Amino acid sequence: MQLHPDLDPTEGNCKGLAAWYIEKGHFTNGTNIDRTSNTDNEDANNNSINLADLNVVVSVHAPGHMLTGPKWKIALYLDEKANNDQKDALTKIFTGQAGGEFFIEILPRIGEILGIRSVPIEFNIEGKKKRRIKIPSFVEMEIEGLTGRDPNIESKVVNPAFSNTPGIDPFIARSTRHTYNDHGLEWDNSGKNAFYCRFTYVP
């Protein structure tokens, strides 16, 4: 999600998907998705909920410029593998209730949450540059990183004006497939831009 406040959206509105696979991470009383979590759902003090190996997908529809236009409509998709505590933690994180640099920034832009579903989410990494996400009946997304002058180095956006990975420059990709159909919204962004990277969210 890379934007510039002075450039209007090509089609007059913005619509897309953001997906997260949590390698390792935990939730305490704020957002903390990192690579140092415990292996159980909660730590010895029952104060930290393990979120490792879970997926989250968010659909976003902004009826204008995402930064300066009308507020967004979003829908949240949580990994069905998550237990109730994990679902509650993920909901708080990805709706901005738990804070965190990126989520605090987008919270005022959200006008409506269309729904929160617990669904099977398939996530796959193929080599360095390919990522796939699928939610049966709702989402299909495949992206592939672009090849730069040196094919062994991933091309990236340096210092973007807005990003869902603050402080981390994302790699540039192209969506070979990107379809969505739910909550009365439907689109096909196949062939358009995409981004990916590894990162850490902290409170």
Cite the ranges covered by each PLM segment.
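N-terminal ordered "arm"
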Residues: M1-F27
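Domain-exit/linker segments immediately C-terminal to small folded modules
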Residues: N13, T31-I33, K73, K87
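A generic short-segment signal for beta-strand/edge and adjacent turn/coil regions
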Residues: H4, D8, D43-N46, F102, ...
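A generic structural signal for short, solvent-exposed coil/turn residues
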Residues: T10-G12, S48-N50, T68
